Design a protein with these regions (language model features):
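Long, amphipathic alpha-helical stalk/connector segments used for oligomerization, subunit docking
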Residues: 339-434
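Core beta-strand elements of the Rossmann-like FAD/NAD(P) dinucleotide-binding domain
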Residues: 63-73
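Mobile, glycine/GP-rich and aromatic-enriched active-site lid/loop segments adjacent to catalytic centers
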Residues: 1-52, 122-315, 398-509
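Catalytic phosphate/nucleotide-handling subdomain of diverse soluble enzymes
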Residues: 295, 299-362
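Glycine-rich loop(s) and the adjacent beta-strand/alpha-helix scaffold that form part
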Residues: 73-136, 315, 319-332
Length: 509
């Protein structure tokens, strides 16, 4: 393997991937088709092989169209999930978060509803980023070695050796793992030593001490300034506008850091996602019984594959690793399709009609009851997508370890939260939508709901605090290696029952 933490031009990936898709379309000719602006709401199970995925249904978010897809093999690639927990940005900036607002947890919810296992759903990521804009800190941390200090001018990193000793040997690793650094920020915040400031202006002072040649110094400062602004304008334009709004020149003033809201991203510094089959030559034999067949990146549901954020227990893929995993899953699905040439998806007209009625039900609910009140936003007969989302986020934030409690929770809090989630789940039937955009929001809410409950139930099942900087349990505030296992969750759509499975953590390296 090569070096880690190498700077990349990640914003250019989309162009490269789009070129590959364009080339594939050219090769396929009339057989190729790309459909955009389609919201996939459900996966379809084959009616002759009920444990096999045979397609999907959804609707256009721009036109009055209902889509039914039949397939020999299906790949779910919808990113992770944000806004399951309440974002810190409210009101004018509502929804501003570190992850794109359009990742609604569909990759997790669809696998779950299809009968698949999810793993590590308690392991959310909490990125420490620039306050309110969530701009990237990597360039400053890694490239320019920019110092970060608490409000009394001290460093929080390494300031709490006694508390972190509970998580040895992980807390002693170099570099310090992200959950440990985050936990140090939490401990520092509990002492009131906030805000945290990244002293970008100190980098300029360091350059002045290190470089005596005026021309070289000017060149170095110019490079620093252009790298900083370019990084934000490429990735997080709001970061640059936030500086301007606060009259901050990063060459002259420090910038505030803050831990963000919790997000689900199985390809970054956490490992939530689907329990997936590994390569035949590396996957331990104890895991094989979970899968209907041996194909790399296939979920526990036959014919359903995923990659990137969809694959659980496989953290730190980032951009390049997700790209590689995409290539791996592409080869796997081709092999699966070739091995199953005789298979023809069986989906009845009755099933197609049932899902159509289900998907568009929020329209009917709205039209039936909209005149009951003087304003359509508040109505005793239905709930709007926004109000459903607010309720979900409030429950998750206050009971399941959001920023509202400084990422802390407990069994009693989680039990109360799961009870409230069950009440919220009853209101899925009462979601209403006045247009296609709200219909999309309604189904995003449903997907986020399933992700939230999977998270809460997994956190309740785990009797330790394995990632204290992402979330910790007041009643199990330590690392317990007798609990060193994968906690998986399943959902039965027919009985509406959840089940927890524990699988051993078997090192393969």
């Amino acid at each position: 393997s090569g070096e880690w933490q190498v700077m990349i031009a990640g914003e250019s990936y989309k162009v490269l991937v789009a070129e590959a898709a364009k080339s594939a379309m050219a090769a396929l000719g009339d057989k190729g088709q790309i459909l955009e602006r389609v919201m996939i709401t459900h996966l379809l199970k084959d009616e002759k092989e009920p444990d096999r995925v045979a397609g999907a249904v959804g609707f256009s978010v721009r036109e009055d169209k209902y889509y039914v897809f039949k397939s020999k093999v299906t790949i779910a690639l919808m990113g992770g999930a944000v806004h399951v927990f309440r974002p810190r940005s409210q009101g004018e900036a509502f929804g501003r978060s570190w992850m794109p607002p359009f990742v609604a947890g569909s990759v997790y919810a669809l696998v779950l509803e299809a009968g698949g296992e999810l793993t590590q759903m308690d392991n959310t990521f909490v990125p420490p980023r620039f306050k309110d804009s969530y701009g990237p800190v990597g360039t400053f941390f890694l490239l320019f070695k920019t110092p970060v200090m608490n409000s009394v001018g001290g460093s929080y990193v390494g300031a709490y050796p006694e508390q972190l000793s509970k998580w040895a040997p992980y807390s002693n690793a170099k570099p310090c793992p992200t959950p440990m650094r985050n936990y140090e920020m939490i401990l520092c915040a509990k002492e009131g030593k906030i805000p945290f400031m990244m002293h970008t202006e100190m980098v300029v002072e360091r350059f002045k001490q290190e470089i005596s040649d005026p021309k070289e110094l000017k060149k170095k400062i110019k490079m620093y300034e252009s790298e900083a602004w370019e990084d934000f304008l490429d990735m997080t334009i709001a970061g640059a506008t936030n500086w301007a709004a606060h009259n901050i020149d990063p060459m002259e003033k420090p910038m505030e850091l803050q831990m963000s809201d919790s997000v689900f991203i199985g390809s970054h510094a956490c490992s939530c996602g689907s329990w997936c089959c590994g390569p035949e030559d590396l996957m331990p034999a104890q895991y094989k019984d979970a899968f209907p067949a041996q194909y790399n990146c296939m979920t526990t549901v036959k014919g359903l594959f995923t990659a990137g954020c969809g694959v659980g227990a496989c953290a730190h893929k980032f951009s390049s690793g997700s790209h590689v995993q995409g290539r791996i899953v592409g080869k796997s699905v081709v092999k699966f399709a070739n091995d199953n040439k005789a298979f023809t998806p069986t989906i009845s007209d009755a099933t197609v009609a049932k899902y159509k009625e289900m998907i568009f039900k929020p329209f009917a609910t709205f039209e039936t009851h909209k005149n009951f009140t003087t304003t359509p936003d508040v109505n005793p007969n239905y709930i709007s997508p926004h109000n459903f989302l607010f309720r979900l986020q409030k429950i998750m934030g206050e009971y399941a370890g959001g920023w509202e409690t400084l990422y802390g929770t407990s069994d009693k809090l989680l039990e109360a939260g799961i009870w409230k989630l069950s009440l919220l789940g009853e209101d899925i039937e009462k979601l209403a939508a006045k247009d296609l955009h709200e219909l999309m929001r309604a189904w995003e809410c449903v997907h986020r709901y399933y992700v939230g409950e999977a998270c809460a139930r997994t956190r309740l099942a785990r009797k330790e605090s394995r990632w204290p900087g992402y979330y910790y349990k007041y009643d199990y505030l330590k690392l317990d290696d007798t609990q060193k296992n994968f906690i998986n969750v399943k959902f039965d759509v027919k009985t509406k029952e959840w089940s927890i499975l524990t699988r051993p953590m078997i090192p393969i390296i």
